[in-house]
């Protein structure tokens, strides 16, 4: 497990160096790491989503497969995801921002590494890891938006002019839909399904005489309690991001006016 994680970590780091040197515009001086990372995240999100989806389809059938099943796709997904979070942790630590602003994302990276690392170590709960991992679909459109919003060196402006207004609006709409389906709906569904399975495994009369999951008695409190808590944390983070994305989508569609500097000064004077 560790050699594979190290391999993908160094591979991603190497690709980021190449993107920084040969693709990132020279005009970007400060946030070069972030720009290169946003480029790489588009194909990487597609890889993570497809491997997670493949594993979910294979492991969905029974209690035993959902809790004890392992596939090549589920292992690859978690390995690459851990590596990606290690790289993102380094990038976020290097970013010139107050530590207070970094804490939510650093917590996200740390909890993801620990949770998925636990799944790879025990060989259990791969389905639940991959079901959570379907949220990576949202990064396809999110990274495009972040690239377009790059203010340094007018890199974002150049991308916007190349892409065009229609595709930008379409990307924003798909981002909103993706966030709603793969985060706002997915995480509550994950929690509901998880607790139903736990109830069936430990709370039904049948479970006392015939365990639904052979070896299920070995599940630790970390797996049964901490994993749902991590998913709740992801849901709260996603909700906060969803509010911002909704406001951005409304502005893009013209339903919400963007505040000008003059309007902001007027409000300050009134206060």
Feature map (PLM): residue ranges:
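Membrane-helix and juxtamembrane interface regions of eukaryotic multi-pass membrane proteins
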Residues: 1-132, 152-271
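Alpha-helical transmembrane segments and their membrane-interface exit regions
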Residues: 134-145
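C-terminal transmembrane helix end/exit motif
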Residues: 147-150
């Amino acid at each position: 497990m560790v050699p594979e994680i190290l391999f993908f970590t160094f591979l991603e780091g190497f690709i980021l160096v190449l993107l920084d040197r040969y693709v990132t515009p020279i005009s970007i001086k400060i946030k070069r790491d972030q720009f290169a990372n946003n480029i790489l995240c588009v194909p990487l999100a597609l890889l993570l989503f497809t491997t997670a989806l493949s594993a979910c389809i294979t492991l969905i059938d029974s209690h035993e497969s959902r809790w004890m099943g392992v596939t090549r796709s589920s292992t690859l997904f978690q390995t690459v995801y851990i590596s990606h979070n290690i790289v993102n942790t380094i990038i976020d630590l290097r970013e010139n921002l107050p530590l207070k602003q970094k804490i939510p994302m650093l917590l996200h990276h740390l909890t993801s590494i620990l949770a998925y690392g636990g799944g790879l170590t025990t060989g259990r709960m791969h389905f639940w890891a991959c079901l959570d991992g379907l949220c990576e679909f949202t990064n396809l459109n999110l990274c495009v938006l972040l690239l377009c919003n790059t203010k340094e060196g007018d890199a974002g402006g150049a991308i916007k002019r190349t892409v065009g207004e229609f595709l930008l609006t379409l990307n924003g709409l798909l981002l909103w839909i993706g966030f709603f389906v793969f985060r706002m709906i997915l995480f509550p569904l994950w929690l509901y399904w998880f607790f139903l399975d736990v109830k069936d495994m430990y709370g039904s009369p049948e479970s006392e005489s015939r365990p639904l999951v052979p070896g299920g008695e070995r599940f630790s409190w970390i797996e049964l309690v901490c994993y749902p808590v991590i998913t709740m944390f992801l849901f709260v983070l996603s909700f906060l991001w969803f509010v911002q994305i909704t406001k951005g989508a409304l502005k893009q569609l013209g339903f919400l006016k963007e505040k000008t500097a003059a309007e902001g000064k007027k409000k300050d004077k009134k206060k």
